[in-house]
Amino acid sequence: MSAERLVNPHSDSDDQQVEKSLRPRTLSEFIGQEKVVEQLRIAIAAARGRNESLDHTLFYGPPGLGKTSLANVVANEMGAKIKITSGPAIERAGDLAAILTNLQANDVLFIDEVHRLNRAVEEVLYPAMEDFALDLVVGKGPGARSLRLNLPRFTVIGATTRLALLTSPLRDRFVAVHRLVFYSDDAMTEIVSRSARILGVPISPEGAREIGRRARGTPRIANRILRRVRDYAQVVADGAITLQVARDALAQLEIDELGLDENDRRLLRAIIELFNGGPVGLSTLAAALAEEVDAIEDVYEPFLLQLGFLQRTPRGRIATRRAYEHLGLPYPERTLPADDESGPQQATLF
């Protein structure tokens, strides 16, 4: 169910086609992530000035924030070709060897979900990143011998939503590590306005801001919502997205003022109504919602934690006072604060 949500930050096949047309090509076109962009600008200028390939770079952060877009921008700024793959797609060491031997000087190899590379593949990648060499074993048995094949200098750009799952040897081989954060409302408004121009959709500044501020600080979600609001404006209004049209469309899509959809509210209500506000274990909560544990951790929780609606404690998940207030539910006064280290206490009955 989470894969069908408008506010799901993960990409689907429909998104991928549209994202290509909306993707920035240069750092000057990239909106937001100012610190990362400035650091990349300096690194790229220095590498080009020395006529060298860019240092291996890692982007990490929640999905939908532009890690793939930045990799394409870096390749374009370096005047290099980019080869795009992902951790799960490289199943065997031979798959990676085939990719590496086809790279040209200064090419960029972008590995999405780099934390999902298996250990055998990582062992091949280590010397390739460090020494620009590919170690091969020729033959079998007693007659087997090792062969080192030199590779042209290239750049590996990795992307991950789970930095902690990267092995230390792999993480250490990335010279530059950049954290991408959720975007501000101003940046989101600018992104929506830019996407609307590219898609040929008339939109007012107020309409763009309304969509942007409800998109959970995530450009992928903003672009997805924009397409749905465009459809609404075309059928119900005169095709232009005004503030009122945006509000009406978002109400129909059940995306509230803070960017929560019905599934977010259902999760919070489950904690509050089924488990007395928590704490509740992740597996128990997933079973109650008929959701996967990974979906709750990766899709639902990051934004709810950012809003302060949810707490993670050693005893389980807890709905905060803010969550009660947002849902219009009375908050039970407790004998100890909800954020006490021992977790929430029994609600006061008398």
From Swiss-Prot:
* Positions of ATP binding: 22-23, 64, 67-69, 130-132, 173, 183, 220
Region Disordered: which residues?
A: 331-350
| Enzyme category, top tier | hydrolase
Recorded catalytic reaction(s): these are:
ATP + H2O = ADP + phosphate + H(+)
**Which E.C. number(s) belong to this protein?**
3.6.4.-
Annotated residues for binding of DNA? 312, 317
Query: Keywords, A to Z?
Result: ATP-binding, Cytoplasm, DNA damage, DNA recombination, DNA repair, DNA-binding, Hydrolase, Nucleotide-binding
Q: Which GO terms describe its molecular function?
A: ATP binding; ATP hydrolysis activity; four-way junction DNA binding; four-way junction helicase activity
Map out region (Small ATPAse domain (RuvB-S)) in residue numbers: 184-254
- Primary subcellular site in the record, as a coarse category: cytoplasm
Annotated Mg(2+) binding sites: 68
Which Pfam families does its entry note? AAA_lid_4 (PF17864), RuvB_C (PF05491), RuvB_N (PF05496)
Where found? Answer: Cytoplasm
Gene Ontology CC terms, in alphabetical order: cytoplasm; Holliday junction resolvase complex
Q: Per the UniProt entry, what are the Gene Ontology biological process annotations, in alphabetical order?
A: DNA recombination; DNA repair
Region entry Head domain (RuvB-H): which residue ranges? 257-350
Instruction: Report the domain of life of the source organism.
Output: Bacteria
Q: Which family does it belong to?
A: Belongs to the RuvB family.
**Free-text domain note:** Has 3 domains, the large (RuvB-L) and small ATPase (RuvB-S) domains and the C-terminal head (RuvB-H) domain. The head domain binds DNA, while the ATPase domains jointly bind ATP, ADP or are empty depending on the state of the subunit in the translocation cycle. During a single DNA translocation step the structure of each domain remains the same, but their relative positions change.
The function of this protein is: The RuvA-RuvB-RuvC complex processes Holliday junction (HJ) DNA during genetic recombination and DNA repair, while the RuvA-RuvB complex plays an important role in the rescue of blocked DNA replication forks via replication fork reversal (RFR). RuvA specifically binds to HJ cruciform DNA, conferring on it an open structure. The RuvB hexamer acts as an ATP-dependent pump, pulling dsDNA into and through the RuvAB complex. RuvB forms 2 homohexamers on either side of HJ DNA bound by 1 or 2 RuvA tetramers; 4 subunits per hexamer contact DNA at a time.
Query: Subunit info?
Result: Homohexamer. Forms an RuvA(8)-RuvB(12)-Holliday junction (HJ) complex. HJ DNA is sandwiched between 2 RuvA tetramers; dsDNA enters through RuvA and exits via RuvB. An RuvB hexamer assembles on each DNA strand where it exits the tetramer. Each RuvB hexamer is contacted by two RuvA subunits (via domain III) on 2 adjacent RuvB subunits; this complex drives branch migration. In the full resolvosome a probable DNA-RuvA(4)-RuvB(12)-RuvC(2) complex forms which resolves the HJ.
State the protein's name.
Holliday junction branch migration complex subunit RuvB
Task: Name the gene behind this protein.
Answer: ruvB
